[in-house]
Amino acid sequence: FRLPRQADNTALHQETDPALKRLVVVASMLALLLGPNVSRAQSLPSIEDTVAVAEPLSGYFNLYWNNLTGQMFWEIDSLNTEFLYQVSMASGLGSNPVGIDRGQLSGTYVLSAKRVGPRLLLMQPNYRFRASSTNELERQAVQDSFAPSVLWGFDIVAETEGRVLVDASDFFLRDARDVTGTIANRGQGHFTLDVNRSAFYLDNTKAFPENVEIETLLTFTSSDPGTLVYGVAANGNSITLRQHHSLVKLPDDNFKIRLADPRIGTNGPTIQDYSTAIDEDLQIRLVARHRLEKKDPNAARSEPVEPIVYYVDSGTPEPIKSALIEGASWWNQAFDAAGFINAFQVKELPPGADAQDIRYNMIHWTHRRTRGYSYGGSVQDPRTGEIIKGNVNLGSLRLRQDYLHGQGLQPGFDYLSSAGGNNDASVNMALDRVRQLSAHEVGHTLGYPHNYLASSYGRESVMDYPAPLIEITEEEQLDFSNAYLQRIGEYDKLAVRYSYEQFPPGTDEGEELAKIVQESLDRGLLFMAHNNNNFVGAGHQYASVWDNGDNLVDQLKTEIEVRRIGLANFNPTLIREGEPYSELEYVLLPLYMHHRFQLNSAAQSLG
């Protein structure tokens, strides 16, 4: 194959039919005349025309629900502006080992919408690595060294005066929580999302001035579901869960970051700052904290501009609900020590409020088939450590385990009966534990990790793992009245002071924070978190779990004696009338193993 010579091309051109030449001229003229109309036909329609039959939800972002097509349109009016995106679970599977719970937080993302031609990309910057330098090129070098992410891409379907509209149905109706991966990792089958049995849950899809809340109903199917799934789902081959999405306006730039100190336990973002001096630590550890400011910055004690308010799940039964409110409210004692008056409040979630709404700090009462962990976490601004939402999940079956513990130790213990008569001490022990647990998990949402040393200096932190302190009377009876300390700890007050104390204008904050740290050392209010201290043979003598006492071996002797008295009193009256004797086994187990954690701790203290 060869190309014709130029002479041949010329000859061909010269021999072209005159009629064909006229046709080419006419076609060219038509193209010029129709060109603008063709361009207009290819331009995007207006947003108003596209959503003419849709129901608007106006807020921080505008959404449009088309009830005829089942589409959810998302209008973005500020391109390249960062916002917060949070995923959570509005309903749960009900299996503790699988770990998909009602009210559970999932991914937190800072995103911005970037337009590239006909596409809109949700960009996630990488805030874990940065440079605080004033040199723009230095900052850009760090930014280009660590990969950002594109969370999603959309086709733009309409636009009006710089505002763009996308069909966000697939984005919201996806498995954002990775339910399928979680179930598979637990060995409970291979599930897939069935889009034909999934839809928007419009009752909890709402728009507000600074946040938009979208909820979806997702159905997952499998031909090989595991026994844990079968044990809790209505149909193990098909499980339906509600997933929640929050699109939130990020806080303004007026929040002041505070640097962490390892001697006071705080959680928060850790950032690698490549502009630090060569003789300084590359890692910058921020304190996670709510935005809390005094009305009067010059006053030693002042009411806050806005208090921190936590809400208890309105589906919690009494007397547990009141116990949760009371225990969480202990933290107000710590904020009072930091100079704030009535800065921390706990209330019941008001009627009509959505627990998944990002504006509510929540304490959820979560049911599962079996007993499991309670936990507390928070939604944080990764740029500053500012806490945007605190979120607690308390497993309801924990209380029943505490009931079994007390039931074995004291004849006549009856958790399900009303408090009164001979059962007062036993019922109060269980509720005391609920108060302590509420304070403990709320502490995690406030940014505080476990402090396993506190049991060695008078139980002065609710952030320890507490064993019930059962005391023996002179009559060799068991006294439950001091089983769980019913107040905030002195260490907790220092931790809140470090995180939140507001110093008068002109004060050197670094010097004042150093004084708080030194006070904790001088008073012996020390901190030690996980750091491999959860097992026999761990490094620290006293940083152990579920123990009591400053001498762990001596306290072990006491726990063995408590166990002996409990076993001596063990009899069939420990179970309810009409129950089979086989139920005694469930009561006996926690009694028989009463000393087990103290034994572990004593062994650890000996090395």
Segments predicted by a language model, with ranges:
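Bacterial N-terminal signal peptides that target proteins for export
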Residues: 3, 12-25
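Bacterial N-terminal signal peptides
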Residues: 25-35
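Sec/Tat signal peptide C-region and signal peptidase I cleavage site
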Residues: 37-41
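Auxiliary tRNA-acceptor-end handling modules of aminoacyl-tRNA synthetases
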Residues: 42-316, 348-401, 406-425, 434
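The catalytic-center signature of Zn2+-dependent metalloproteases
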Residues: 63, 348-367, 432-487
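Zn2+-dependent metallopeptidase catalytic core
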Residues: 81, 317-343
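Sec-exported extracytoplasmic/periplasmic mature domains
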Residues: 329-340, 443-444, 448, 468, ...
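Conserved catalytic/binding loops enriched for acidic/polar residues
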Residues: 455-607
